[in-house]
Amino acid sequence: MNATIFALLLLLNLAMYNAAEQSSETDMDDTLLIPENYRKGCFKEGHSCPKTAPCCRPLVCKGPSPNTKKCTRP
């Protein structure tokens, strides 16, 4: 009985592995590419830039003092 259960689990594992492998094959046309310049969590030009989140590329965090830094072009 233990051998039967083991064999069934092995077959189920192989079936799930094959299904997962086939579903992971995607075309680049089907995927949505997000530009790195506007990734989630970055600040746009003119926004104050605390240490918690970076400025969107190619912007840099500049300012005369740490409290007045803003995202600006380099």
UniProtKB/Swiss-Prot annotation:
GO cellular component terms given for this protein: extracellular region
Region forming the signal peptide: 1-19
GO molecular function, one term: toxin activity
Subcellular location: Secreted
Tissue localization of expression: Expressed by the venom gland.
Tagged with keyword Hydrolase: no
Coiled-coil ranges per UniProt: none
Record key words, sorted: Disulfide bond, Ion channel impairing toxin, Knottin, Secreted, Signal, Toxin
Residues making up the propeptide: 20-39
Domain of life: Eukaryota
Disulfide bonds: 42-56, 49-61, 55-71
Transmembrane spans: none
Purpose of the protein: Probable ion channel inhibitor.
Domain notes: The presence of a 'disulfide through disulfide knot' structurally defines this protein as a knottin.
Homology family: Belongs to the neurotoxin 36 family. 01 subfamily.
Protein name as catalogued: U5-theraphotoxin-Cg1a
